[in-house]
Amino acid sequence: MKWNDSGFDQGAFEMKQLRIEMKGDINDWLSYRYRQRLNRGNDGSGNIDNVPTSIDWAGVGIRLNKFSFFAGKQCVSYGGIEFDLNPIDIYEYSDMIEHMSNFMTGLNVAYNYNSYQQIQFQVLNSLNGPSEEMYGDLERTKLPLVYTLNWNGNFLDVFKTRWSASVMNETKGEKMYYYALGNEFNFSPKWHAYFDWMYSREGVDRKGIITNIVGTDNQAHNAFNAEYMSYVLHVNYRFAPKWNLFAKGMYETASVYKASDEVEKGKYRTAWGYAGGIEFYPMESNLHFFLAYVGRSYKYTDRAKALGEDNFSTIVCQWDSFGRCLYSSSCFPFLFVMKNRQATCCLPAIYHEMSFFYQN
């Protein structure tokens, strides 16, 4: 149920996520994975890889001793703990992740130094659809690819890392550089936390946040020289075997790092996000009920206000349940810390939400 400044807006049941997934091992060296969103369109005829965006995963994996390979549609191996979590476990994403294109087609190569240290190198398409849909009338690059180097570390199950560095060909002569440092902490069986830092420097604004602020009425392309930075801290306290308290904070900035097209250099927006709530797990991992309070606050600088922007805040209260298959869903194709691998057919992950929404 949603309210806005005018009062009651809408009351309806809604499935945020509805996916079907199959993955498993054919033998000790060959595996497969397929996942599709059932509540997204299935037309991939105009896409660069000829695959609809409803398909997140469609590929084959090969394991050869310490090396692993995965070819096909897959998730970009960006760093960050939250980026790798199952989407149905996230009540509110940061703007950085919310505006990303996460599933593209290509090749991933992983080297497992041991059971606790892994390096990945990945080359994927940087686009799903045509370049014009993402960037406008700018001349397209002939190699629309994104290259990512990723380190996944595990230190005594107390401190874990998901760090990455990426470079992406956007349009001719323009690139995006993206860095993510994900840090997970298991202080005790009851206390768990993660802290993510993300930075994106984009020759052409791929996220679209700066473009929406500065406007492109006299341009047929996205803004140039956008810069985004995000900090995310999430803490869990499992105060009882079936009960969990959580709190989350986010701080993000959107800036222009070099003036161009009459767009002034400097910061345009600061965003704060916060969430807190309680979760109840009647079973070990298959289902949980929740009550969550989520707030966002957006503050614009004077240069953004001169372009017509104004500060605003949103509040959403959510309550209901998550259901998913027992086999957890990870963004990374190589779950190298798992000892037992077996063929699994996952039931659809369903997220149905009742909300109270307020915007000021």
Predicted feature locations:
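Outer-membrane beta-barrel pore domains
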Residues: 4-8, 47-48, 157-340, 354
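N-terminal amphipathic/hydrophobic targeting modules at extreme N-termini
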Residues: 44, 340-351
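A short secondary-structure junction signal
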Residues: 83, 120-122, 130-135, 162-164, ...
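Residues that flank catalytic or metal-binding motifs in active/ligand-binding sites
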Residues: 16, 54-56, 103-105, 145-147, ...
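Solenoidal tandem-repeat scaffolds enriched in leucines and small polar residues
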Residues: 128-130, 136-140, 151-154, 158-161
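Solvent-exposed loop/turn segments connecting transmembrane beta-strands
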Residues: 12, 40, 45-50, 99-104, ...
